[in-house]
């Protein structure tokens, strides 16, 4: 703890911190996952989840179940928890909680714009959007032909508006430009969130700095790997990296010139916190990289609960619940497709 935060935190934040720690206690354990892995069909999964926090959300769902139904209902639990915390929060906690949903808003914008580019039905796309990232004018995203129109017609009245200053070009929207837009928006969002947490100070600043720096570094690695072999120049690649994190600035200089996965690995192994992640991979492969990053993120998120009187527990809980939903989606898909031998390939255990 820092200063006298502990003396005053509980006045406005104590109730919600108790609530979120209660939610954390309701996350699935390793024993739950072991039981889920034994399920023979989706109804078995529903039956096991009926004894968890997801029970009330799935109890009225008729058979036959689909994976999308399970994911949708479990996501509804996450959304309800978030809305309850947000309506109880006062400043600056309410602003902190709002920041948590901006990433989903960016993903929804990219989903709608990409789907429209490929002539998908707008209503179908909206149904696939994450509920935490919804905003009033989201359906009108389909009319935009370039970045300027996207901003002027739709996004100027959303919280994402300040992040668009680097994206305002008249270039037509194509797959490459949309992906650049996504990463530019995420860069601006992460830097803004990081600066906000620094202003809060104390344990919140310390823990969130670590969590957001890890997120920024992971995105830098993914941007590098995904842009290898594309027409994106080294300078353009470097512009997409966030201006903070363990890799900033020298790691970014090296990542910008990488031309294959082994060169990326060589850069990352110079940083002790990331050596363990890349040691799990054989040379030339990147399939296990996402899981290794998720495992490291979960470890850091769980550590956020070791301290009290800070806001990082809210961020950590939301991320852990999202990881849990990804786990349930993977398990459900494997069971539905009779691929139970692959269940452990992507499940990230928490407790």
UniProtKB/Swiss-Prot annotation:
Which gene is annotated as encoding this protein in its UniProt record? VHA-d2
| Signal peptide span | none
**Entry similarity comment:** Belongs to the V-ATPase V0D/AC39 subunit family.
Q: What is this protein called?
A: V-type proton ATPase subunit d2
Q: List the GO molecular function terms.
A: proton-transporting ATPase activity, rotational mechanism
State the disulfide connectivity: none
Annotated membrane topology? Peripheral membrane protein
Instruction: Spell out the InterPro entries in the cross-references.
Output: ATPase_csu/dsu_sf, ATPase_V0-cplx_csu/dsu, ATPase_V0-cplx_dsu, V-type_ATPase_csu/dsu, V-type_ATPase_csu/dsu_dom_3
Which UniProt keywords are given for this protein, alphabetically ordered? Hydrogen ion transport, Ion transport, Membrane, Transport, Vacuole
Q: What is its main location?
A: membrane
Q: GO CC terms for this protein?
A: cytosol; Golgi apparatus; plant-type vacuole; plasmodesma; proton-transporting V-type ATPase, V0 domain; vacuolar membrane; vacuole
Q: Does the keyword Cell membrane apply?
A: no
Q: Tell me the SUPFAM superfamilies matching this sequence.
A: V-type ATP synthase subunit C
Transcription keyword on record: no
Q: Cross-referenced Pfam families, in alphabetical order?
A: vATP-synt_AC39
The protein's role, per its UniProt record: Subunit of the integral membrane V0 complex of vacuolar ATPase. Vacuolar ATPase is responsible for acidifying a variety of intracellular compartments in eukaryotic cells, thus providing most of the energy required for transport processes in the vacuolar system.
Q: Where in the cell is it found?
A: Vacuole membrane
Question: Quaternary structure per UniProt?
Answer: V-ATPase is a heteromultimeric enzyme composed of a peripheral catalytic V1 complex (components A to H) attached to an integral membrane V0 proton pore complex (components: a, c, c'', d and e).
